[in-house]
Regions:
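Conserved tyrosine-mediated DNA breakage-rejoining catalytic core shared by Y-recombinases
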Residues: 160, 169-210
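N-terminal core-binding DNA-recognition domain of tyrosine recombinases/integrases
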Residues: 22-120, 136-142
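Catalytic-site neighborhood detector that most strongly recognizes the C-terminal catalytic loop/helix
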Residues: 192, 275-310
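Short, charged phosphate-coordinating catalytic segments
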Residues: 90-98, 157-182, 268-270
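Basic, Lys/Arg- and aromatic-enriched nucleic-acid-binding interface segment
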Residues: 79, 113, 119, 127-164, ...
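Active-site/catalytic core of tyrosine-dependent DNA strand-transfer enzymes
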Residues: 204-246, 252-257, 262
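C-terminal catalytic core of tyrosine-transesterase DNA break-rejoin enzymes
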Residues: 155, 159, 252-278
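DNA breakage-rejoining catalytic core of tyrosine-based enzymes
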Residues: 114-135, 193-205, 219-225
Length: 315
């Protein structure tokens, strides 16, 4: 007598999927994602196929778990790989109309890790760190155009607190539009933001002439900042941080904006909105509303006197 699949325990059950199904799912999953996210999805997909060869069973799921825990020590890495596998099992459950696929995710749970709660970040950034990077740029042998692009990128990140990935997607048209408005407020579109939040970014007066120079003569669809080249330059020409043993990275400038904002009293909802940070609660999505002129006024009230570009500035 033939045993119905649902009558089998997971210990005995074996299911199949094709490499084509996995490729199609991966392609759909990685559409319009950042390079870093795509890299992790590709890595997880490779691990899944190499370990299972199209067979879903208790043994292959355990093999994925053991391989991942042995080769990756970071709790976040486990989550990314296991999360992809679980989502693919859910996909197979829906497309093949067989709930047994999803049942196998019980074998790929992350081990419980007790995390220490850090009350303070150990990475402290100050205006001196940004100034030192500016000095390093000014004394470099870079061509003028490249030097100006890197300098403007550095100051834009420091004065706005935007994510590097967001800044990398900004177009000449967006910046030109912001420069013609009163007040000068740039709109980041939802598809440019990590958490898909359309938000306003006030442009500090220090940035205005730099952005005008950077966008002059360029096409509307061009990207504004050469962030990849700047990241490579910083790697090859490291800038030592003043308060900790470490080198400046572009992502540090978001921390600088956060820490400097706390120092000068810019620590309300406007700051979080500008940074697109901590804004996913129901209170935010349902009740908060921001007008560009109000966001700009509050920002300038606090940040207006901060002149990082001036080596003699007390700020």
């Amino acid at each position: 007598m033939e045993i119905e699949p649902n009558a089998l325990s997971l210990n005995e059950l074996q299911l199949q999927y094709s490499h084509k199904e996995l490729e199609q799912y991966l392609k759909a999953k990685t559409t319009q994602l950042s390079e870093k996210s795509v890299l992790w999805f590709n890595k997880a997909s490779t691990i899944l196929w190499d370990t299972t060869q199209g067979i879903i069973s208790k043994d292959t799921m355990n093999a994925i778990r053991e391989y991942t825990l042995s080769n990756y020590k970071c709790h976040d890495s486990w989550g990314k790989i296991f999360g992809f596998v679980k989502s693919f099992l859910t996909h197979l459950t829906r497309t093949r109309m067989n709930s047994n696929y999803q049942s196998f995710d019980v074998y790929i749970e992350k081990p419980r890790v007790r995390k220490e709660i850090k009350l303070l970040t150990s990475r402290i950034l100050t205006s001196d760190d940004v100034k030192n990077a500016l000095i390093s740029l000014e004394s470099s042998n870079l061509p003028r155009e490249k030097k100006q692009n890197f300098k403007t990128t550095l100051l834009f990140l420091a004065y706005t607190g935007q994510r590097v990935i967001t800044v990398s997607r900004l177009t000449v048209k967006q910046v030109k539009d912001a420069l013609t408005k009163t007040p000068n407020v740039l709109t980041v579109e939802a598809n440019q933001d990590k958490i898909r939040l359309q938000h306003y970014v006030p442009l500090h007066p220090v940035l205005i002439p730099l952005l005008k120079d950077l966008t002059e003569g360029k096409q509307d669809g061009d990207l504004v900042f050469c962030y990849n080249e700047f990241m490579r330059w910083l790697f090859q020409n490291p800038v030592q941080l003043t308060n900790i043993d470490g080198k400046l990275q572009l992502k540090d400038l978001r921390k600088f904006f956060e820490q400097k904002s706390d120092e000068i009293g810019f620590n309300d909802a406007n700051k979080n909105f500008i940074m697109s940070h901590g804004v996913s609660s129901i209170n935010w999505t349902s009740y908060k509303q921001f007008l560009p002129e109000n966001v700009y006024k509050r920002y300038i009230d606090c940040w207006g006197s901060v002149d990082i570009n001036n080596s003699n500035s007390p700020n």
